[in-house]
Amino acid sequence: MSERIIEGSTTTLHPGKDGAGVVRRTVLPGGLRVVTETMPTVRSVAVGMWVGIGSRDEAPEHMGATHFLEHLLFKGTPTRDAMQISASIEGIGGEINAFTAKEYTCYYARVLDEDLPIAVDVLADVVTSSLVTEEDVESERGVILEEIAMHDDDPSDVVHEQFAAALYGDSPIGRPILGTVESINELGRERIAEYYHRYYRPRRTVVSVAGNVRHEEVVELVTRAYERAGALSGPAEFAPPRTSGPGADQRSGVRVLDRPTEQANLVLGTTGLSRTDDRRFALGVLNAALGGGMSSRLFQEIREKRGLAYSAYSYTSAYADTGQFGIYVGCLPSKIDDVLKICRDEVSRVVAEGLSADEIMRGKGQMRGGLVLGLEDTGSRMSRIGKNELVYDELMSVDEVLARIEAVTPDEIGEVAADVLMRPLTLAVIGPYGDKDFTDVVR
């Protein structure tokens, strides 16, 4: 979507029904996009400001800067200090937070519909006008180091991080979002501020709002807030969705962290599909049947029939040009060989035999329910339209997505299984294994 857009132009992305579910987009000067979805039966609104920059975009000298910056933007602006930022929203019964992902960062708030002006003003102030002072950098450095320490104490988190590192090597998409102790200690104020001013531009930003709102009012509020910050200028031309990124080459291998844990944690998997691959719906059904719930093959075989683990599931992650398909299990260290054999056997059986009609039906049902039930509140609706506007060329309606799920055929599932599940495997393990050799698992 690289064509020039007329400043202030408004497009209806989805017509909705009976005044509900109407999704509209306005493009402002500088390429800032405002997307809203009407939910007239609720009394709340969710506001998100999405910036198309994530940990994947970091150069080696910036590792951890995206997440560091997310913290710093809440420390203060010329008009609000950290206490005033949080109190402005919490004092009206709302919530405010942010998160950093591999390919984007989001700042969001949820408030009563009557308090929409406050939420927009505070978030815009945070995103456009952070001071990023030396004092704040040093103060927040300690907070982030504590966050890394907390994360490192949870092996179920670390094993997923180790899997990504083994899968993608030392490329940016394989690095931890938080950075490392070493990289955080090396990041200085000047480097972070330069990163902020380079990437936090209107053409990379989407403001998404869902709830009991009028699109015109939202556009007016956003325009006023961004103009006050001097952040609206230039042609209304926004950055197109990314189609690739640095360092997404897949590797095969084993990564073992020897730790004296009571439970072993493992992820066995490979690369998945990109978020625009049409086969993603078939892979979603396959994933649901293989390890998506208590009725899935892996859960039944590993936990229900053999009692080898408490937690066992499969998952998919999708990025611009690659993805992940993984199987996670937490088990007693003495049971890991049995668990890995079951995982390999079930993957091989799916490739050789496909899924039964009953499994396909349950997999589709799980995907349908997960989609629809996940859109019952303003926050999830805001996230859906904001993320879709930032990373896709189009916004598929819920009915369109449901139709794509229902249209998945057994042959399509078989074809995607033969592709994805036959790719070179990668294994990450955390547990008391010393120099135990797991290389046979990935051959």
Regions found by a protein language model. Give the residues of each.
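Scaffold signal of the M16-like zinc-metallopeptidase fold and its non-catalytic homologs
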Residues: S2-I6, H151-R203, V222, G374-A407
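Active-site-adjacent, His/Asp/Glu-enriched structural segments that form or flank metal-binding
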Residues: P60, L73-D157, R189, Y195-R201
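M16/insulysin-pitrilysin zinc metalloprotease superfamily fold
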Residues: G76-T79, R110-V143, Y313, S317-G374, ...
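Short acidic/His-enriched helical or mixed secondary-structure segments at domain edges of catalytic enzymes
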Residues: L145-V159, G245, L257, E304-K305, ...
